Amino acid sequence: MKSELRFQLTLSVVAVATSMLAGYAASETAPPSLASPDSFASIADTEARSAALFTELGKVLTHPRCTNCHPAGDRPRQGDASRLHQPPAVRGADGHGLPAMRCSICHTNANFEPGRMPGHPEWHLAPREMAWEGKTVAEICEQIRDPARNGGRKVEDLIRHIGEDTLVGWAWAPGGVRSPAPGTQKQAGALVDAWVKTGAACPAK
């Protein structure tokens, strides 16, 4: 009986160790890169070049690190598989959760690696009108340049928002076994800058 228990414990330890190693390997995997704005210089038509720049940026905007917090409903999603958040948190009136379950209860000022808990001082869901989950890159483009659906921003404001905002920047340093968004925040900001300067055109639907 003791030997059987010992065997079961050994199997459990091996399973946990294997899971941890797999998670570590996943966290060490380099994210896909982003093409630089210069890569699109050969596109002579300015509008077509602008649309191509946004299509490249779309690799970031449609990544789970972004769409999980820009959900179609009132519940955030989590993980690379975009599962519904557990425990079942909901948006609340201000995007920071319900009075009894504020986002900040679990999501503190920084990532908490022992618990694989993401964190940032302003952790919250994007407003409903900024939902991207399930949308095409073209649909997100039309939305993100519309002040009524982008938080009241001009397209020029998006350069700093995507390129410098620290909550947005969390997507490139998510911790745990979460895959980071493609490229770097600086590269994403450069794409937004080039997109705006070429007229902020959107890809064809």
Ranges and model annotations:
Residues 2-52, 64-68, 72-77, 193-205:
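Post-cleavage N-terminal segment of exported redox proteins
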Residues 48, 55, 64, 117-205:
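C-type cytochrome heme-c attachment and multiheme electron-transfer modules
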Residues 23, 71-74, 80-83, 117-120, ...:
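General "foldedness" signal
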Residues 5-11, 21, 34, 53, ...:
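Generic detector of leucine side chains in alpha-helical contexts
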Residues 65-73, 100-110:
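The canonical Cys-X-X-Cys-His
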